[in-house]
């Protein structure tokens, strides 16, 4: 995991997805972050959160991982304390993210774990049922760079507010030219 760029199983940050041109502006100040996908910054840069060693604490049915990202790491402003808690209760897995920043910054955490709930060798995940409690998403341009706006999921292939099969819309042209889900 330290040398691969695939991010398999990783907690992604400080900013999941792409930052176009590896720069952004907060409060009138431009910040340049580490480019690692052409001219863009993908998943927090060359040494994103998925490459870090996290502290952890175990509780019954849960484990919490914590990482402190110092001010200036990969070019991002402000120290950030990130926590990710995994809970397994009955047959339900939940992943909860928390981040606290010391000053205005960019934080967008996600997980890059891929589950096939049918088990190894069971085939496609198209029939898996997914629920996502999100009413909006970040549209992207043709280079998968977020446009900076939020759009409603209603009426799109990204609407999983009620349980739906993953494969129902997986190959829609509006999903990355038919390549699948790659959205916030």
What label would you give each PLM region?
Residues 1-184:
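An exposed, glycine/acidic-rich loop-and-rim segment of catalytic or binding clefts
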């Amino acid at each position: 995991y330290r040398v691969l760029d695939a991010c398999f199983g990783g907690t992604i940050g400080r900013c999941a997805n792409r930052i176009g041109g590896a720069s952004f502006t907060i409060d009138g100040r431009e910040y340049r972050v580490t480019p690692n996908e052409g001219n863009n910054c993908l998943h927090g840069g060359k040494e994103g959160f998925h490459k870090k060693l996290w502290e952890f604490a175990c509780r019954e049915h849960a484990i919490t991982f914590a990482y402190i990202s110092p001010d200036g790491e990969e070019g991002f402003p402000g120290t950030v304390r990130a926590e990710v808690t995994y809970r397994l209760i009955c047959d339900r897995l939940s992943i909860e993210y928390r981040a606290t920043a010391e000053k205005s910054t960019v934080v967008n955490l996600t997980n890059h774990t891929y589950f096939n709930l049918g088990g190894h060798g069971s085939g496609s995940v198209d029939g898996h049922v997914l629920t996502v409690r999100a009413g909006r998403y970040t549209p992207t341009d043709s280079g998968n760079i977020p446009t900076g706006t939020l759009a409603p999921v209603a009426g799109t292939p990204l609407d999983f507010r009620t349980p739906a099969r993953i494969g129902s819309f997986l190959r829609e042209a509006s999903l990355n030219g038919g390549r699948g889900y790659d959205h916030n």
